[in-house]
UniProtKB/Swiss-Prot annotation:
<feature type="binding site" description="in other chain">
    <location>
        <begin position="537"/>
        <end position="541"/>
    </location>
    <ligand>
        <name>beta-D-fructose 2,6-bisphosphate</name>
    </ligand>
</feature>
<dbReference type="GO" id="GO:0042593">
    <property type="term" value="P:glucose homeostasis"/>
</dbReference>
<feature type="region of interest" description="Interdomain linker">
    <location>
        <begin position="393"/>
        <end position="410"/>
    </location>
</feature>
<feature type="binding site">
    <location>
        <position position="27"/>
    </location>
    <ligand>
        <name>ATP</name>
    </ligand>
</feature>
<dbReference type="GO" id="GO:0005829">
    <property type="term" value="C:cytosol"/>
</dbReference>
<dbReference type="GO" id="GO:0003872">
    <property type="term" value="F:6-phosphofructokinase activity"/>
</dbReference>
<feature type="binding site">
    <location>
        <position position="121"/>
    </location>
    <ligand>
        <name>Mg(2+)</name>
    </ligand>
</feature>
<comment type="function">
    <text>Catalyzes the phosphorylation of D-fructose 6-phosphate to fructose 1,6-bisphosphate by ATP, the first committing step of glycolysis.</text>
</comment>
<keyword id="KW-0021">Allosteric enzyme</keyword>
<dbReference type="GO" id="GO:0046872">
    <property type="term" value="F:metal ion binding"/>
</dbReference>
<dbReference type="GO" id="GO:0005524">
    <property type="term" value="F:ATP binding"/>
</dbReference>
<feature type="binding site" description="in other chain">
    <location>
        <position position="745"/>
    </location>
    <ligand>
        <name>beta-D-fructose 2,6-bisphosphate</name>
    </ligand>
</feature>
<feature type="binding site" description="in other chain">
    <location>
        <begin position="670"/>
        <end position="673"/>
    </location>
    <ligand>
        <name>beta-D-fructose 2,6-bisphosphate</name>
    </ligand>
</feature>
<dbReference type="GO" id="GO:0005945">
    <property type="term" value="C:6-phosphofructokinase complex"/>
</dbReference>
<dbReference type="GO" id="GO:0005739">
    <property type="term" value="C:mitochondrion"/>
</dbReference>
<dbReference type="InterPro" id="IPR009161">
    <property type="entry name" value="6-Pfructokinase_euk"/>
</dbReference>
<feature type="region of interest" description="N-terminal catalytic PFK domain 1">
    <location>
        <begin position="1"/>
        <end position="392"/>
    </location>
</feature>
Amino acid sequence: MNSEINQRFLARGSQKDKGLAVFTSGGDSQGMNAAVRACVRMAIYLGCKVYFIREGYQGMVDGGDCIQEANWASVSSIIHRGGTIIGSARCQDFRERQGRLKAANNLIQRGITNLVVIGGDGSLTGANLFRQEWSSLLDELVKNKTITTEQQEKFNVLHIVGLVGSIDNDFCGTDMTIGTDTALHRIIEAIDAISSTAYSHQRTFIMEVMGRHCGYLALVGGLACEADFIFIPEMPPKVDWPDRLCSQLAQERSAGQRLNIVIVAEGAMDREGHPITAEDVKKVIDERLKHDARITVLGHVQRGGNPSAFDRILACRMGAEATLALMEATKDSVPVVISLDGNQAVRVPLMECVERTQAVAKAMAEKRWADAVKLRGRSFERNLETYKMLTRLKPPKENFDADGKGIEGYRLAVMHIGAPACGMNAAVRSFVRNAIYRGDVVYGINDGVEGLIAGNVRELGWSDVSGWVGQGGAYLGTKRTLPEGKFKEIAARLKEFKIQGLLIIGGFESYHAAGQIADQRDNYPQFCIPIVVIPSTISNNVPGTEFSLGCDTGLNEITEICDRIRQSAQGTKRRVFVIETMGGYCGYLATLAGLAGGADAAYIYEEKFSIKDLQQDVYHMASKMAEGVSRGLILRNEKASENYSTDFIYRLYSEEGKGLFTCRMNILGHMQQGGSPTPFDRNMGTKMAAKCVDWLAAQIKANIDANGVVNCKSPDTATLLGIVSRQYRFSPLVDLIAETNFDQRIPKKQWWLRLRPLLRILAKHDSAYEEEGMYITVEEECDTDAVA
């Protein structure tokens, strides 16, 4: 089924007769508060009566003060907090019919027939059972004279929508569950911190991470920190695993590596079903290798801390979509889970997802390991393949001849053009190792176009890129210089090094440069090689992709800074902060940071604003302050307007807010480029580069003659690899020209603009802002392949 994005008109107050409740159940995860906030505020916008059910199903059974009406202020200043403000508990009573009968009565007395369930597969299964029994529960309540027949008729259908909150990412049907990205942040922060002490003392660290039945955290954490060995439930090693582990670690030490990291998921076991614990691994290393091995059990640290920007935005989108799904539900509607498919919020039948999730557990219990990995989805499968390849010490012998030359080896080059961005080094490492694994030779071009012309080119070996994944910046060096006017010198260098395929990693400049080189193919035969671009810039302003490498790290930096800036006004007086973000003419950072930071407004170039809009926002801020809100946050993209500068907006708010609030201005600058790349950027760089190696090899193979001369003339041999909707896509550069605004260096169409109405709905106080209605995009269910 092809996906369709339907625009629907949602009028303010259009659902006045409906009652909706939101609750969190099971284990907590970071981002749940953002989901609760989005559900509540979207429901208030639509005119519903909204309730919190505190302490999960237990609160539903107990009733009384556990079910409280929520208002706009109930969910203020919670988006940045971990855990769940409404509490979560495991509930034995709800498992019994008598408990569910009490819960049904408590809901009916308050007119609640719409439930948003935020939890894991157990919580969602319980909610579905409750929905199926609803009619018989009501019959019993009427029979007991607990409710009237009028109430039974009025509330005869219960609608439920699920949101999956779980740090394990163990739910089939969604690419990411709420909390997983933040848990990965905690794991990577811990490993990055431990690496320095391990390096100092030549230690082996064994890190135990959560994941009793799912190895996602261990697997992706291992990819993001270059772990030497991982143990996960879906890929149990053979009983001789101690031999393989020791052989791998010993080889790495002899190759000069000072630190080793082994990650163990808490549910790890061998093929016979015997558990493998961190203690077992330490014992093996101590006895056989005599290494100084230490154990770190992360435990509940992974559940804690502030949610990442990704989890906040995911929860905002899912929470709003859950409310809309409930409002549109009919008595015949199948209950759905709001899932993430690639970069799209979709609705997926709840029980299909639950059954598939349970099928994974069944496959593992029956020792059908390959089936278990397959059921986890393509994303998990590819992560596993990538991990296995990248952690080999040496490329496989069968890909090389007796002289050590690659049997089907080509000569590839990689370079950066543009500003540095986090994730570039991870992409280079992956590109180098994937290519060498195949038998290719890889050249690293230092300092972009200028370095190429100067001959600053060297062959990169397998161990040259060790330890690159977790490092920010660009180790190869990068400059913004474009090739225009220097084609002759560039062609001469490509000829000198016999380059047969080129990868360019960088921002808008890399896309522009690749296009310029491809345009000169008729004049310079050396340019008739396959060329591919990986977009890498915090601005996220490159056409042909929805995310560029580095923008997640930039977004997290801004979100974290906004949290700190806002906290600086805690306990003092009413204050508004005006913050300027980077991004050139692209408003991605300002908009998404606004959504993740709970900003009141975000001014960007793509959405024109007038003095009237600014005035309206000042009045809105004043009315919020008058009703007890103590802090306001305004974001402005650096090139949002030539005349309405950050200073102008700051002065306007300062003048108009006299007597009500004070105003402060912050220009964030280069700290937004980030320190250490986020797990998202590390893994995106790793996967994208792996795909580029396969693509370059396929293009060279199809266009090479007997003498080894590559002749690529067709437009589809110069491409940009991007994430588009649900999958990775290689887009010919010539096709992207029509989609590009070269003057402002931005794409003409940008997916995130459809999130701006959501930003305004979640920021506007009911009494402060009256509008007839608002267009917001409702994204429908889709069953195509997810981004893998």
